[in-house]
Amino acid sequence: IFTDVDCGYCRKFHNEIQDFNDLGITVNYVAFPRSGLDSVSYNKIVTAWCSKDPKSVLTKMKQGQDVQLSICQNHPVEAHFLLGQKIGITGTPAIIKSNGELLPGYLPPEELLTRLN
């Protein structure tokens, strides 16, 4: 799932991640700061990726909590963003099925399960 820490529907999806997992849906995030590589959103998601506990920091950010920005050098965020652009991602969340099909936007857990099958 291509995600942005400042995307409202990405936050909704993240808050329901346990519901997706309970249905057997595995969620893997790919960073896609919609505002680009020279943005606060980019710095936020890099901070999460570079932290000692990325899941916890990402959750705090998606809950709107302030987190001290800290940028490291070895992270995949730029590569994720460029991949998203290359395959035509224009918004988030953007769900990529295992067969490569794009499901743009937020889908509730039960609907996503149906669309994945």
Walk through the language-model features, giving the residues of each.
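Short active-site neighborhood of thiol/selenol oxidoreductases, capturing the structured segment around
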Residues: 1-8, 27
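C-type cytochrome heme c attachment motif
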Residues: 5-12, 94
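Typically the conserved alpha-helix immediately C-terminal to a functionally engaged Cys/Sec
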Residues: 10-23
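Short hydrophobic alpha-helical module
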Residues: 23-26, 51
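Soluble periplasmic/extracytoplasmic beta-strand elements of cell-envelope proteins
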Residues: 26-29, 94-96
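Residue-level recognition of beta-strand->loop/alpha-helix junctions
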Residues: 31-33
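Thiol/selenol-based redox catalytic cores and closely related redox-interacting motifs
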Residues: 36-113
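Short, solvent-exposed mixed-charge patches
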Residues: 116-117
